[in-house]
Swiss-Prot record:
The gene is atpD. F-type ATPases have 2 components, CF(1) - the catalytic core - and CF(0) - the membrane proton channel. CF(1) has five subunits: alpha(3), beta(3), gamma(1), delta(1), epsilon(1). CF(0) has three main subunits: a(1), b(2) and c(9-12). The alpha and beta chains form an alternating ring which encloses part of the gamma chain. CF(1) is attached to CF(0) by a central stalk formed by the gamma and epsilon chains, while a peripheral stalk is formed by the delta and b chains. CDD domains: ATP-synt_F1_beta_C, ATP-synt_F1_beta_N, F1-ATPase_beta_CD. This is ATP synthase subunit beta. It is found in: Cell inner membrane. GO terms for cellular component: plasma membrane; proton-transporting ATP synthase complex. GO terms for molecular function: ATP binding; ATP hydrolysis activity; proton-transporting ATP synthase activity, rotational mechanism. InterPro entries: AAA+_ATPase (IPR003593), ATP-synt_VA_C (IPR055190), ATP_synth_F1_bsu (IPR005722), ATPase_a/bsu_AS (IPR020003), ATPase_alpha/beta_chains (IPR050053), ATPase_F1/V1/A1_a/bsu_N (IPR004100), ATPase_F1/V1/A1_a/bsu_N_sf (IPR036121), ATPase_F1/V1/A1_a/bsu_nucl-bd (IPR000194). Produces ATP from ADP in the presence of a proton gradient across the membrane. The catalytic sites are hosted primarily by the beta subunits. It comes from the Bacteria. It catalyses: ATP + H2O + 4 H(+)(in) = ADP + phosphate + 5 H(+)(out). Its EC number is 7.1.2.2. Its main location: membrane. HAMAP family: ATP_synth_beta_bact.
Length: 464
């Protein structure tokens, strides 16, 4: 350690997770320097220089028992975490320390969690599709390899289950490395995820970083950066890596919690005034370069189901595909509860996905949109008042709606139905048959919770 690392300061004020520390005026710590409480492992991160040798810091850990006058040492460098292969198969906290009781992480390489985003000329956009095996996603909002995807939804509509199914389908097929950052979510889900990975023998290819909802705001604010730093290292080694974040909203919320304590004026709806900058700094680093790619899937909680709330609205602009989960669709018992009219993807372009896929997607959306427009008329006057064309549109739309449902592998224990992985070709073939009228003779319940269109035909035989 350098001489600067030995500089000592004293705590002068504690307000929750925000701690003020006084240092000699000639050796004030820099912004983002990590400070360590003498005699403990508690880390503080410098956020502001207040002048007269006083710095304002965020506490990365519980601030219980802290008091004025305690000694703090300056490490003179930002928080660094272990990266590389030794992190695979391990569960770590925000500082990269193992929390799985499996011994220390023997990594010789560490990396600061604060990095600059790659330069513009290093970026490498991709148009290659990533098949997920989930019909509604592959058809309506296909993912790009090396792209960024957001799963938007309110409380209890299935963000985490969708995320787990994507991990199940992509990470297992992918064969490369994955990093999972649990940001302010339930510890039980983190535990379930660990055992799910272990049972399917892919744990040795996954690094897990957790800062769950019982932890202080400093941990939740920085844990996404810790996970991202590990993913960036694999990318810079020339690998294609998957990066999962659950939940990006909690990252924003942690920023809101410390923002007022740092003395910033709240902005719209009480969010921090630096919301767009904080989100931009994180999202701009999640990108693919000429060396390797990061394909990222992020769950985004939508407060009170309001997509115009500043937090989800700020996230939208950074994503290549948005999967919007709808409470109305979930209430019909259709899972995954993806809204096919609200969800979008930049890959929906005939030059990228091909003419056939593009035309089927648009025809499916047109049919569903027509049904949405007719719903009020049906509710008031009934189906009999519709023209024959509209009756046909409604019948097909209801079949499409049910065919967009699918049993998940990760939900087998709850539903009792075996999960289905549907290849993209089968998805396109199935929806083409419905919009072309080849399934008009089948009852709509035959399409509910099946995989391919052939299964719908078999189910129809059993029903009749």
């Amino acid at each position: 350690m350098s001489t600067a690392a030995l500089v000592e300061g004293k705590i002068v004020q504690c307000i929750g997770a925000v701690i003020d520390v006084e240092f000699p005026r000639e050796s004030m710590p820099k912004i983002y320097d990590a400070l360590i409480l003498d005699g403990s492992e508690l880390t503080l991160e410098v956020q502001q220089q207040l002048g007269d040798g006083v710095v304002r810091t965020i506490c990365l850990g519980a601030s219980d028992g802290l008091r004025r006058g305690l000694t703090v040492k300056n490490t003179a460098k930002p928080i660094s975490v272990p990266v590389g292969k030794p992190t695979l198969g391990r569960i770590m906290d925000v500082l990269g320390r193992p929390i799985d009781e499996a011994g220390p992480i023997e990594s010789e390489v560490t990396r600061s969690i604060h990095q600059k985003a790659p330069a513009f000329d290093e970026l490498s956009p991709s148009t290659e599709l990533l098949e997920t095996g989930i019909k509604v996603i592959d058809l309506i909002c296909p993912f790009a390899k090396g792209g960024k995807v957001g799963l938007f939804g309110g409380a209890g509509v299935g963000k985490t289950v969708n995320m787990m199914e994507l991990i199940n389908n992509i990470a297992k097929e992918h064969g490369g490395y994955s990093v999972f950052a649990g940001v302010g979510e339930r510890t039980r889900e983190g535990n379930d995820f660990y055992h799910e990975m272990k049972d399917s023998n892919v744990l040795d290819k996954v690094a897990l970083v957790y800062g769950q909802m019982n932890e202080p705001p400093g941990n939740r604010l920085r844990v996404a950066l810790t996970g991202l730093t590990m993913a960036e290292h694999f990318r810079d080694e020339g690998l294609d890596v998957l990066f999962f974040v659950d939940n990006i909203y909690r990252f924003t919320l942690a920023g809101t919690e410390v923002s007022a304590l740092l003395g910033r004026m709240p902005s719209a709806v009480g969010y921090q005034p630096t919301l767009a900058e904080e989100m931009g700094k994180l999202q701009e680093r999640i990108t693919s370069t000429k060396k390797g790619s990061i394909t990222s899937v992020q769950a985004v909680y939508v407060p009170a189901d309001d997509l115009t709330d500043p937090s989800p609205a700020t996230t939208f602009g950074h994503l290549d595909a948005t999967v919007v989960l709808s409470r109305d669709i979930a209430s019909l018992g259709i899972y995954p509860a993806v809204d096919p009219l609200d969800s979008t993807s930049r890959q929906i372009d005939p030059n990228v996905i091909g003419e056939e896929h593009y035309s089927i997607t648009r025809r499916v959306q047109q049919t569903l949109q027509r049904y949405k427009e007719l719903r009020d008329i049906i509710a008031i006057l009934g189906m009999d008042e519709l023209s024959p064309e509209d009756k046909l549109s409604v019948a097909r739309a209801r079949k499409i709606q049910r065919f967009l449902s699918q049993p998940f592998h990760v939900a087998e224990v709850f539903t009792g139905s075996p999960g289905k992985y549907v290849p993209l070709k089968e998805t396109i073939r199935g929806f083409k048959m419905i919009v072309d009228g080849e399934c008009d003779h089948l009852p709509e319940q035959a399409f509910y919770m099946v995989g391919t269109i052939d299964e719908a035909f078999e189910k129809a035989k059993k029903i009749s």
